Amino acid sequence: MLYQSETLQLHWLENGIAELVFDAPGSVNKLDTQTVANLGEALVVLEKQSELKGLLLRSAKAAFIVGADITEFLSLFNEPPEKLHQWLVFANDIFNRLEDLPVPTIAAINGYALGGGCECILATDFRVASPEARIGLPETKLGIMPGFGGSVRLPRLLGADSALEIIAAGKDIIAKDALKVGLVDAVVAPEKLVDAALSILNQAIDGKLDWQAARRPKLEPLKLNPTEAAMCFTIAKGMVMQVAGKHYPAPLTAVKTIEAAAKFGRAEALILETNSFVPLAGSNEARALVGIFLNDQYVKGQAKKLSKGVSAPKQAAVLGAGIMGGGIAYQSALKGVPVIMKDINDKSLTLGMNEAAKLLNKQLERGKIDGLKMANILATIQPTLDYAGIERAQVIVEAVVENPKVKAAVLAEVETLIGEETVLASNTSTIPIDQLAKSLKRPENFCGMHFFNPVHRMPLVEIIRGTKTSDKTIAAVVAYATQMGKTPIVVNDCPGFFVNRVLFPYLAGFGMLVRDGADFRQIDKVMEKQFGWPMGPAYLLDVVGIDTAHHAQAVMAVGFPERMNKDYRDAVDVMFDNQRFGQKNGQGFYRYTQDTKGKPRKENDEQVDALLAQVSQPLQKFSDDDIIARTMIPMINEVVRCLEEGIIASPAEGDMALVYGLGFPPFHGGVFRYLDTIGSANYVEMAQRYTHLGALYQVPPGLRAKAEHNESYYPVAAALLDVSISQPA
């Protein structure tokens, strides 16, 4: 053994070849600060070996290196910029020394080589991968860019176009595609990976392969003539702005950095990369996006804990077909859980089966499944007008019309036909679970399972715990949601649960703005372009369905009369009374026609202004800040109340429910991250200016207390014990 640390070992093979093996204590290898320092120490040892002829890098895990340790990111980003800069210079010196070894080097890549893992293999002369390997640089998805030389080496290895596509989009690619673009030199079966790598290395040692020629382009300026460069980078910048927009600066920064570095060799190009990385790391967007990654890990970890030792059901059932029931049945069947789909109406069953078939057809068109698999999946959805076979289901999801009497009757009826262990769940969006549980003899077996529309696209499932719901029931439903490929978040019961409870105050803020003379089009524009929502409130109401929203608004008003009841007609009432239900009937706040692909196309409708004049002040211009404050303060206050009342268990779960369930702008990170970013004291001071608008604008006491003590919702990232920047002699 030449060198050994907790995460890597260095030892001799035959023929003067040394092997560097990444083997961290956990299930995966990460390129954390300690491993980077250890790599530097191993290289010091290697540099002293006069008999060294070649170096092989490999992993002892199922994946090569999954990336940097993202749990360290917020701590690193909290370091003073000059210290982070210093550490990056230190780290890059290590990768340069790997690249500059006076012998040929090769990486044998199995599984993932992402982020820092990809940057590590870019520093070797040759790369060989197994077929399941995935290689890429996902940093821009976290609000940063490659920091270990990825933006320097990848363009010089692949050419600018292919490299920009990977870096700007934060992509990873499979082994065969990596071979096509020149990212790897060979793809071989996993059991032959090391032998193939050694064969290439020995050919290089024997002079049959020119390893110095393989290395040289990575050290030199990018080979692009001025015309090619202008075209390549102009197109890339245009596409990035179109896709990422102004709220996500990392992709454009990466493209501009690669462009600026194109005329330089490695040393100067790395300086530009580091100079671009440090400001991105200190940005609010990076903190928010890294926070989302960490929160996602936390939420998935909570789901694992809650469903520990519990398997997903072998058979499920959905009561109520149509679009929603069909969507749930499709998702269940697609992920391997056969499902009975029951409805009293043959037309609804046809609609549900057609929905499942349509979604499977899309999978077929994209090459995700073949015709046989499609037929097999569809065969696991059993449509029925009666309860035949219902006793086989371990979990039954009720998805009938959003009417408490109808839901209660259906649940009570099915309970008489099933075993004492069978779990019942309601896909209600607003009706309290405790209210529905009154119709059941076994309320401990009952909970809410709120899917979001469209089911196949929306990652969140709200699992609602009623007063009498057992832990066993929650475990079964969480396991089912996880098997379906969803992110389950458990919330406690109240009208609207969490997501809809906090959505309707936002829509109420919109309604009050329109009442006071704001143009709904301006509100939509500001909330989309400035705040970053995927759609503004008027457009959202049209997509959800104004009849659906009108009904839910009434339920919320009964549930929270002190805040959500209103004594005036608003824009939603006017739309509803005039049967303008949104996209579903082609007219709402906007008019909808079909585009060439059959999708609804939004257009202005002048009739709407005349209708809204019944309930609005004369049109007047509001500032962007006013529009954002008047819509967001009610939502933010309600989100905080949900935490204070124990409806949600943590800021992380609240923020992920908002991002996954409502499309809350990821670059803000969720309401709690947003509050931490602007500061609770600043928020309270701003909200004070709007308290005259009513109860929705009153800041909850817990948030006032945080403001007084200058506290945050997320813990401040602890400083890393030792970010080593000294190289042993």
Swiss-Prot record:
SUPFAM superfamilies: 6-phosphogluconate dehydrogenase C-terminal domain-like, ClpP/crotonase, NAD(P)-binding Rossmann-fold domains. One of its GO terms (biological process) is fatty acid beta-oxidation. Substrate binds at D296, N500, Y660. GO terms for molecular function: 3-hydroxybutyryl-CoA epimerase activity; delta(3)-delta(2)-enoyl-CoA isomerase activity; enoyl-CoA hydratase activity; long-chain-3-hydroxyacyl-CoA dehydrogenase activity; NAD+ binding. Signal peptide: none annotated. GO terms for cellular component: fatty acid beta-oxidation multienzyme complex. The active site is at H450 (for 3-hydroxyacyl-coa dehydrogenase activity). The record marks E119, E139 as: Important for catalytic activity. Gene3D superfamilies: 1.10.1040.50, 2-enoyl-CoA Hydratase, Chain A, domain 1, NAD(P)-binding Rossmann-like Domain. Its EC number is 4.2.1.17, 5.1.2.3, 5.3.3.8, 1.1.1.35. Pathway: Lipid metabolism; fatty acid beta-oxidation. It holds the Pfam family ECH_1. The keyword Nucleotide-binding does not apply. It comes from the Bacteria. Keywords: Fatty acid metabolism, Isomerase, Lipid degradation, Lipid metabolism, Lyase, Multifunctional enzyme, NAD, Oxidoreductase. The keyword Isomerase applies. Residues 311-729 are annotated as: 3-hydroxyacyl-CoA dehydrogenase. NAD(+) binds at M324, D343, V400, V401, E402, K407, S429, N453. Residues 1-189 are annotated as: Enoyl-CoA hydratase/isomerase. It catalyses: a (3S)-3-hydroxyacyl-CoA + NAD(+) = a 3-oxoacyl-CoA + NADH + H(+); a (3S)-3-hydroxyacyl-CoA = a (2E)-enoyl-CoA + H2O; a 4-saturated-(3S)-3-hydroxyacyl-CoA = a (3E)-enoyl-CoA + H2O; (3S)-3-hydroxybutanoyl-CoA = (3R)-3-hydroxybutanoyl-CoA. Disulfide bonds: none annotated. Heterotetramer of two alpha chains (FadB) and two beta chains (FadA). In the N-terminal section; belongs to the enoyl-CoA hydratase/isomerase family. HAMAP family: FadB. This is Fatty acid oxidation complex subunit alpha. It comes from Yersinia enterocolitica serotype O:8 / biotype 1B (strain NCTC 13174 / 8081).
